[in-house]
Amino acid sequence: MAKEEIRDAVYTRRYIYNFHYHLIWVTKYRNKTFVTEQLSNEMKSILQLVADDNDIVIKKMEVMPDHVHVLISFPPSKAPTSAIKALKGRSAFIFLRRHPEIRQSQYWGCHLWSPSYYMSTLGNMSNTSTIKNTTKLKNALTGAKGAYPSHD
């Protein structure tokens, strides 16, 4: 399959992938921590640093006073839980180390983030497109239509 046939796909030596996750997590006790633009931007830069270190691509990110939204993509060799652990764990460690006053006043237990999170996948093709592309691929591989029985 030619590269131009799969829009926004990532090509590596071993695989091609194109999937995205929408991830949301909240601060511990829903504390409103990122109340200034400076704190919000600092968390964005920390999350970008962590993502870069862990082969995670952040497509979109919003840091709200008490929660974070990210649209991420990462190789299929990485488990979604590993990506979440990296983003939440490392960002909390770096942020609280930089802000001991916030750690002492709001997060006495040393946890910036609530342990829970929401994650969903974002599809980039409809069922019709998937069926059409699968049929197209089958035809390309067999060299002619009708080489294998259809399961329609």
Where are these regions (language model features)?
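Basic nucleic-acid-binding interfaces
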Residues: 1-152
